[in-house]
Amino acid sequence: MTTVPCFIAGLPKAELHLHIEGTLEPAMMLRLAERNRQPPPFPDVETAEKAYRFTNLQSFLDIYYRSTEVLVTEEDFYDLTLAYLEKAASQKIGHAEIFFDPQAHTVRGIAFATVLRGMEEACREAHSRLGISTRLIMCILRHLSEQEGMTMLNEAVRWKRWITGIGLDSSERGNPPSKFHNLYREARREGFFLTAHAGEEGSAASVKETLDLLHVDRIDHGVRCMDDPALVKELVRRAVPLTVCPLSNVKLQVFGSMQEHNLKAMLEKGLMVTLNSDDPAYFGGYLNDNFTAAAEALDLSFSDIIRLAANSFNASMLSIVQKKIHLLELADYARGFAPGH
C-alpha cells in the first residue's frame, strides 16, 4: 500500500501562506552576510539552528527581523525567492502565493523597488523554467502604525502589475484588525485581494473582527475560530479559506504538540482549510513536511489529504480556468491510489 509520505510527495498542491523572508536558511543567511560584508546574525549554522527554539510568536519575530538584515541587494531577494521556488517545484507545488514584508527592509534604507524587482525576476524565471505560477502579497506590519502602512499601500498601487494581494502580519496581540480598517478599505477600493493573519495568538474574536471590519477574502491561520461555534458556522457558510500552518503552530506553542492540533476537527466541521509552511527555515519543514506531520499525527485519510490539496487551489487567486486545470491534475493523480488509509 502507498505510504502517506510517498503519496504527499507527488501530490499536486498550492501554497498560500509563505513568508519569503521566512525561507532564509542559515547557510544562505551566512553567505549573504559575507557577500554584503555584514556581520552575520549568527557565527555559524549550528548556532543559528539552536537559536530557532521559540516560546511564542514574539520570540520568533525578534530573530526573524534580525536575520532579514542580510538582505540588501536585488540579487539577494532574487536568490532567496528562486531558492524557495525551486524547493516548491520539487515538492509538486504548482502555484505559490508569497508574502513579503517591505517595511522590514525600507526601514533599513532598502528601496521598495529593490525588494520587488529581485522577487519578480525570480518568479518569472521559475515560471519559465519550472512551470510554477506565483502571486505576490505585500504584508503590512501590524506593530507599526496604519499611516506607515498607508505609505506601503501607496507603493503597492504603483506596482500593481506585480502585487496582487495585501496582507497583515507580525504581532497580533495589542494590534487589532480595527487598527487597519481605513487601510483595508482603501486596498479594497484599489482592487487588491485581501487577507490577514488572525486567530493565531489572537482569539476567535480577532478572526470575527477581521472578517467584519477588514472584509478579507482569506484568513491566515485562523485556528482559534474553533472556540466560537457561531463563527465556525459563518466561516463554513461563506466558504472563507483558512491558511493553516501546523508545524508553525507547534513550534510557536499555539498547540503543545501536533497530536493536539485542531486541523482534523476543522475539516470535520466543513471549514475550507489549506496547509502551508509559513516560515519553513525557522519552523522545521516545508509544505510536504507539514502535510506528512499532520497526516501522521492526526490520522488523516487519503481523502482528507486530497481535500486539503483541492482546497489549496480553490482558495487561491488563480482564475477559474487555471483552478480547473490544477484540479484535473490532482484528480488524475488521486485516481491512481486507494481511497482508504
UniProtKB/Swiss-Prot annotation:
NCBIfam families linked to this entry: aden_deam, PRK09358.1-6
SUPFAM superfamilies in the cross-refs: Metallo-dependent hydrolases (SSF51556)
Keywords: Hydrolase, Metal-binding, Nucleotide metabolism, Zinc
EC class (word): hydrolase
Active site (record annotation): E200
Catalyses which reaction(s): adenine + H2O + H(+) = hypoxanthine + NH4(+)
Binding-site residues, Zn(2+): H17, H19, H197, D278
Site residues, Important for catalytic activity: H221
Presence of keyword Metal-binding: yes
Native species: Chlorobium luteolum (strain DSM 273 / BCRC 81028 / 2530)
Cofactor note: Binds 1 zinc ion per subunit.
GO biological process, alphabetically ordered: adenine catabolic process; hypoxanthine salvage; nucleotide metabolic process
Protein's name according to its UniProt entry: Adenine deaminase
GO MF entries: adenine deaminase activity; zinc ion binding
Matches recorded under CDD domains: ADA (cd01320)
Similarity-based family: Belongs to the metallo-dependent hydrolases superfamily. Adenosine and AMP deaminases family. Adenine deaminase type 2 subfamily.
Functional description taken from the UniProt entry: Catalyzes the hydrolytic deamination of adenine to hypoxanthine. Plays an important role in the purine salvage pathway and in nitrogen catabolism.
Family matches, as InterPro entries: A_deaminase_dom (IPR001365), ADE (IPR028892), Ado/ade_deaminase (IPR006330), Metal_Hydrolase (IPR032466)
Amino acids binding substrate: D279
Keyword Lipoprotein assigned: no
A GO CC term attached to the entry: cytosol
